Amino acid sequence: MMLLIDSGNSRLKLGWLRSGAREPEPAAFDNLDLQALASWLQTLRPRPTRAIGVNVAGQARGEAIAAILAQCGCSIEWMRPRREVLGMTNAYRNQAQLGADRWAAMLGLRMRLPEGHPPALLASFGTATTLDTLGPDNEFAGGLILPGPTMMRGALVHGTANLPLAEGPVTLYPTETHEAIATGIAAAQAGALARQWLAGQERYGQPPEVYVAGGGWTEVRPEIERLLQLVGAPFGVAPVPVILQTPVLDGLAALASAL
């Protein structure tokens, strides 16, 4: 059994690969609660001896995870972005700057697409929102990073004197502060996604397929679906986002299968 570990800014997501089969349901814990990881490891049969993962939560967090795994007799290899792997090339100028989770997620997306696929835009709504594009030639073209919905909301609370920690409906013309904040956050997320969708249409001459992931998707879904209908209409398409549950773990599983 090979463990698959996605150590994100807020959440620790875990899966496994055994004889080509995946976990029936991934595990997820607060990334500060490493005791939950230790307890989960005790439930696994057979006990894993190897793990691969990506870590964007800092060196100390990676070392702490490795130490817990070592107590169970399991070693881990933290994966780093490569210029080319499993048929996917990487246009990032400096590989060391690219978040390993973004790279693994794009690889997970790549492995589910047929040859000759349209451009694909993957939007991940987590602590940060990332909007990354895979071309028909299987090149990761690059993408955007911006604060996720929760971080945007917190920034308004901590960076201003009077704005509340707001939740509310999204409307075209908000007339109440909670609505104004909720709508502004959704509009920022949707606008960034629409920009990258249009950039893909411009670069590749065909409309990108849209894939989404992350815990923030539910909050921004209505505004994104509405805006995608508007930007797609001039091209005769109505993009419908496809939800991916674990694109990072999917990419790690592909790498593990190739080891």
Curated annotation (Swiss-Prot):
A single GO molecular function term of this UniProt record: ATP binding
Cofactor(s), by name: NH4(+); K(+)
Keywords of this entry: ATP-binding, Coenzyme A biosynthesis, Cytoplasm, Kinase, Nucleotide-binding, Potassium, Transferase
Name of the gene encoding the protein in the UniProt record: coaX
Predominant location: cytoplasm
GO cellular component: cytoplasm
InterPro entries: ATPase_NBD, Type_III_PanK
General function of this protein: Catalyzes the phosphorylation of pantothenate (Pan), the first step in CoA biosynthesis.
Organism of provenance: Bordetella avium (strain 197N)
Record's keyword annotation contains DNA-binding: no
Class of the enzyme per the UniProt entry, highest EC level: transferase
Enzyme Commission number(s) of this protein: 2.7.1.33
Pathway: Cofactor biosynthesis; coenzyme A biosynthesis; CoA from (R)-pantothenate: step 1/5
Positions of substrate binding: Y92, G99, A100, D101, R102, T177
Protein name from the UniProt record: Type III pantothenate kinase
Binding positions for ATP per the UniProt entry: D6, S7, G8, N9, S10, R11, L12, K13, T127
Oligomeric form and interacting partners: Homodimer.
Keyword Kinase assigned: yes
